[in-house]
Amino acid sequence: MLKQKALVDVLGQVNTSGVDGSWLFNKEGLLLAYVGSEQKAVASNVSSALIASVWAALERRANDLKETILVLENGVIGCTLVARTMLLAVKADKSADLGMVRAKLHTLAAYLEQPILSISHDLG
């Protein structure tokens, strides 16, 4: 079972070295957990809905989309698929090394894959 407190703790572990936000949400944009800085112009649930919308648009064009990096004027957002049904995103500032952002994203996704699969198996 995936507990909310444990999920928040795990998401918070990647928020170092320029990474200042991490989200876990479904493909429709429904936010399950967010950990990040308090200085944000857009609410985390709105951000997850926007990222999910961008993902859906990209997924229509690419048949087997697994990851995307969005380069923004104030940083980057990396997003990847977890357990076929969930999206994991991390936001980093401009100074963050893109390779480190991707490494954190992939490591966190791999760590969350099995717990999320077991939950979806229990529900389905």
Swiss-Prot record:
SUPFAM superfamilies from the UniProt entry: Roadblock/LC7 domain
One Pfam family, short name: Robl_LC7
Gene Ontology MF: a single term: molecular adaptor activity
Gene Ontology terms: biological process: cellular response to amino acid stimulus; positive regulation of TOR signaling; protein localization; regulation of cell growth
Record's GO cellular component terms: Ragulator complex
Family (UniProt): Belongs to the GAMAD family.
Function: Regulator of the TOR pathway, a signaling cascade that promotes cell growth in response to growth factors, energy levels, and amino acids. May activate the TOR signaling cascade in response to amino acids.
Subunit structure: Part of the Ragulator complex.
The protein's name in its UniProt record: Ragulator complex protein LAMTOR2 homolog
Organism this protein belongs to: Caenorhabditis elegans
Lineage, broadest ranks: Eukaryota, Metazoa, Ecdysozoa, Nematoda, Chromadorea
Gene: lmtr-2
